[in-house]
């Protein structure tokens, strides 16, 4: 199955370069249908597209738990010492996180 998601330019470029291999999202209805082996078509703000394969889903109750368990350099942080779960509150409220949980989507560039 192919899923479509939007990305800000910086994480888009990091995925394109193969540096970021875990995308962090709310585990809402849209992400709950993801499965290993599915494809994600990411679109940047400039309309660029990149296709990746879902390798594994890492599901947690909160970004706090996710940040303690996953390698943050693979989640898009250049300086992991500055990484904090509160960074994700600019995208997802604490109420949304409590309602749905969160997911680290482990991905690999897709080369057809």
Spell out what each predicted region is.
Residues 1-34:
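Compositionally biased, charged N-terminal/linker segments
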Residues 4, 53, 104-106:
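Beta-strand secondary-structure signal
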Residues 58-61, 111:
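A generic structural motif
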Residues 49-59:
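Short beta-strand-centered aromatic/proline hotspots
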Residues 14, 66-112:
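Contiguous surface segments at macromolecular interaction interfaces
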């Amino acid at each position: 199955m192919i899923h479509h998601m939007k990305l800000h330019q910086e994480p888009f470029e990091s995925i394109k370069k193969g540096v970021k291999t875990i995308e962090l999202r709310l585990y809402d209805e849209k992400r709950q249908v993801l499965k290993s082996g599915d494809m994600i078509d990411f679109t940047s703000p400039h309309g660029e597209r990149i296709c990746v394969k879902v390798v594994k889903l890492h599901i947690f109750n909160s970004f706090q738990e996710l940040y303690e368990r996953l390698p943050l350099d693979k989640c898009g942080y250049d300086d992991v010492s500055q990484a904090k779960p509160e960074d994700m509150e600019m995208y997802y409220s604490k109420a949304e996180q409590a309602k749905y949980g969160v997911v680290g989507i482990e991905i690999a560039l897709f080369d057809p």
